[in-house]
Amino acid sequence: LPENSARIDSGVVEFEGENLLDKPSEELSDKIRGRAITFIPQDPFSSFNPVFTIGTQIMELMKWKSPARDDPYYANSASRFWNGYPSTRYEADKGRVLELLREVQLPEPEAILAKYPHEVSGGQRQRLMIAMALLPEPKMIIADEPTTALDVTIQAQILHLLRTLARERDVAVLFTTHDLGTTYEICDRVTVMYAGQEMETAPSDGFFNTPSHPYTRDLLQSLPSREHGIKGIPGDIPALISPPGGCRFHPRCTAASERCSVERPDHTQISERHNVRCFHPVAHKSVGAAS
């Protein structure tokens, strides 16, 4: 990958009251990435190595990211895969892996560990990704459109599983999606982005029922309905290599003024936990929920 392909010009990335941008890379790798914060990818198939069994790969993760990593065995072991484990360590760690696979509702978990990634279904691979994200006992999981490649029935099962596990384990989930139906099903709080800028942040009910940014309103009205059919948003998404100034939605916004093209709005509080970045927020009105 090319180095220095992007930079952070301003702002903070705050986690548990600390700015992660101030952390040394060693601390980020050892304590944050893959431990306190884990990740569920969009495509689980490409995230597995096809030449190793599922069990081998999960056990490798157990070695490097387990909460017990400070154990002298993990710190000093030169072994890479299962055949280097002392029998007592192997049994304890394998038992924890099997427990996790049962928790994500995978049938016959012992048999699954012996399989290769191509030998299980897409839904099972995504459940394995969820189990691997849970293994370090994280405080936050970033889920990157984890249901995109799944059929509707499996999508519903995965969403229900994520919701249940997050509640039971008290884990925050940052869920990235372009699917408004999925947003309605799983999210407690929603941030709407357009061309890399935050437009509006609101509780889920406020997002669907009282949208305050013109883009949020237009986005919801673009959902097909019996009342207005399919209503698109005029114009095109800007090229991010040279985005428009001010609010990036202003070239397509029916409420835009000259000020919108030169100045980016600050946050305006609409209600508790609901704010919008717009000089001309729309009146509150219900537009219905996604279906």
Predicted segments, located by residue:
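ABC ATPase NBD coupling module
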Residues: 5-8, 19-38, 56, 64, ...
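A short, proline-enriched helix->beta-strand linker immediately N-terminal to the Walker B motif
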Residues: 135-139
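Conserved ABC ATPase "signature" region
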Residues: 19, 73-111, 220
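Short catalytic/signature loops enriched in Gly
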Residues: 201-291
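Conserved ABC ATPase signature
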Residues: 116-120, 124
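P-loop NTP-binding/switch modules centered on Walker-like glycine-rich loops
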Residues: 142, 146, 150-229
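Conserved ABC transporter NBD signature motif
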Residues: 8-19, 75
